[in-house]
């Protein structure tokens, strides 16, 4: 269509005026006098949020007309957390199932936001749907009831055939899905179709998809459990003997070999032992695309808790290990070889976790800790000088955002990023109590622990959703967050 220069300028001018008007109408939030901390460093500055994004960072910013001002003097201003490993139910069944996961997007969000986590993940099976229908279903469920933002890992299941098909993989990436998991080497079905899974990981890597691996050798564990039960040693108190460290080590070695042979990126879920971490570190030193997650419980608890009467509360897989393993994981965070902390939140009820009929061969694995994992890491890590606050931000926000293709929209505080911000009180003290938990499970893995440092205010995309102990965000305001196709990230505090 032909158009005069004057007409074109008039339209451009009209667009500029409209954009200016829209910007002027956006709500403004000005956070003053805080210490802004990112993975790269810290600065005393003001932070302007306009609409859903960070608009300006600098000293002595002037408030716009109608701006809400928050005085963050004495506070840390950190990015909202990104939990790369969360298990939520899109919709709870009616009637409820007492022995199943009790948290949906709404209840899981409440705990997350209270703990300073603004973006969670979930694992959803592809089933027989095309990528477009899958994406619509996933986004619809999230945006119907979530308060936190959510990204999704595609679950492969026992049949990897579809994940060897380039068209399926390209369609998934195009719709914002660039990670698969949880791929269970711990299941005997993996070994029965090892070639199929190998081809799926190879094809996924070529398509820009990261494979997330649960690393335990199924045969070692199955034989161990069978032997213990047959010998009358099946009590849950003996569970620490049922899945030895070598089962994790062998599986990590296997996953590293897959990464080396195919070039595909791999993400090792909930690494629990020093020996498994050392295998991954050796792979990183050779430049392989290997990423390590650990789970909060491995940093705070050891296998000694299996002697407690309430042993069921502390059972998950891989199992808890020894003090030397705990120390190695803390060291890995400090030197950058443990890249992320994933809560692996699975909210069984306390009654289900304490079911006395459980044995080493039949138990409910999972921890209710989405609300507490970030405060626990700050209290036990930063407040006790094990790690810096920058490293805290790295493993709980920046690194997961980078690894899973959400950065720089998520995981940082910079102009143009989503305004996911937590005002963190570094000195406030609190005792964790079951009655304060916002999860439907209504208990905490860390009940009775003393915390130093807590979120005071949580802001998700420019909206205050948690403040002074109360969640005020509404279900249905969370968004599905599409991932970018996997590209090798540059991570702070690490050479990978």
Label each residue range with its predicted role.
Residues 164-341:
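Histidine/acidic residue-rich metal-binding segments in metalloenzymes
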Residues 26-29, 36-80, 96:
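Histidine-rich, glycine-flanked metal-binding segment
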Residues 78, 133-149, 153, 199-213:
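Alpha-helix-loop-beta-strand connector modules within alpha/beta enzyme cores
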Residues 9-20:
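Bacterial N-terminal signal peptides
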Residues 34, 355-359, 415-480:
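C-terminal cap of metal-dependent C-N hydrolases
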Residues 34, 47, 52, 74, ...:
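Divalent metal-coordination and catalytic microenvironments
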Residues 72-145:
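Metal-associated gating/positioning segment near the N- to mid-region
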Residues 233-263, 312-314, 334-335, 339-341, ...:
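His/Asp/Glu-enriched, well-ordered alpha-helical/loop segment
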């Amino acid at each position: 269509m032909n158009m005069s220069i004057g007409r074109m300028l008039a339209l451009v001018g009209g667009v500029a005026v409209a954009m200016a008007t829209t910007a002027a109408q956006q709500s403004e939030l000005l956070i003053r006098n805080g210490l802004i901390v990112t993975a790269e460093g810290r600065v005393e500055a003001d932070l302007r949020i306009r609409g859903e994004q960070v608009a300006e960072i600098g000293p002595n910013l002037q408030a716009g007309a109608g701006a809400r001002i928050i005085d963050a003097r004495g506070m840390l201003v950190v990015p909202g957390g990104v939990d790369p490993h969360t298990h939520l139910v899109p919709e709870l069944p009616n009637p409820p199932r007492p022995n199943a996961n009790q948290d949906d997007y709404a209840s899981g969000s409440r705990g997350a936001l209270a703990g300073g986590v603004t973006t969670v993940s979930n694992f959803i099976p592809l089933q027989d749907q095309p990528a477009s229908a899958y994406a619509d279903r996933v986004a619809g469920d999230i945006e119907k009831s979530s308060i936190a933002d959510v990204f999704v890992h595609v679950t492969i299941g026992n049949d990897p055939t579809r994940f060897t098909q380039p068209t399926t993989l390209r369609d998934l990436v195009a719709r914002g899905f660039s990670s698969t998991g949880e791929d269970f080497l711990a299941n005997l079905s993996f070994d029965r179709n090892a070639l199929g899974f190998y081809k799926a990981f190879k094809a996924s890597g070529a398509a820009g998809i990261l494979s997330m691996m649960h690393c335990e050798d199924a045969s070692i564990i199955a034989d161990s459990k069978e032997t213990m039960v047959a010998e009358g040693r099946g009590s849950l108190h003996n569970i620490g003997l049922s899945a030895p460290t070598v089962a994790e080590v062998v599986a990590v070695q296997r996953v590293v070999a897959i990464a080396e042979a195919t070039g595909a990126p791999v993400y090792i879920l909930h690494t629990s032992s020093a020996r498994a971490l050392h295998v991954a570190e050796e792979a990183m030193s050779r430049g392989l695309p290997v990423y390590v997650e650990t789970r909060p419980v491995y940093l705070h608890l050891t296998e000694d808790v299996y002697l407690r009467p309430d042993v069921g509360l502390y059972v998950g897989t891989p199992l808890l290990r020894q003090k030397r393993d705990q120390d190695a994981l803390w060291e890995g965070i400090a030197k950058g070889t443990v890249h992320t902390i994933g809560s692996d939140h699975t909210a069984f009820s306390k009654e289900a976790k304490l079911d006395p009929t459980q044995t080493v061969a039949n138990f409910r694995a999972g921890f209710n800790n989405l609300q507490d994992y970030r405060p626990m890491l700050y209290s036990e890590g930063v407040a006790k000088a094990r790690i810096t606050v920058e490293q805290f931000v790295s493993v709980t926000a920046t690194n997961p955002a980078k690894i899973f293709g959400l950065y720089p929209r998520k995981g940082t505080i910079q102009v143009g990023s989503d305004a996911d911000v937590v005002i963190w009180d570094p000195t406030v003290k609190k005792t964790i109590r079951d009655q304060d938990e916002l999860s439907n499970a209504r208990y905490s893995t860390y009940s009775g622990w003393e915390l130093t440092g807590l979120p005071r205010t949580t802001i998700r995309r420019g909206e205050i959703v948690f403040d002074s102990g109360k969640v005020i965000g509404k279900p249905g305001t969370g968004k599905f967050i599409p991932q970018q196709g996997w590209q090798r990230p540059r991570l702070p505090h690490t050479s990978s």
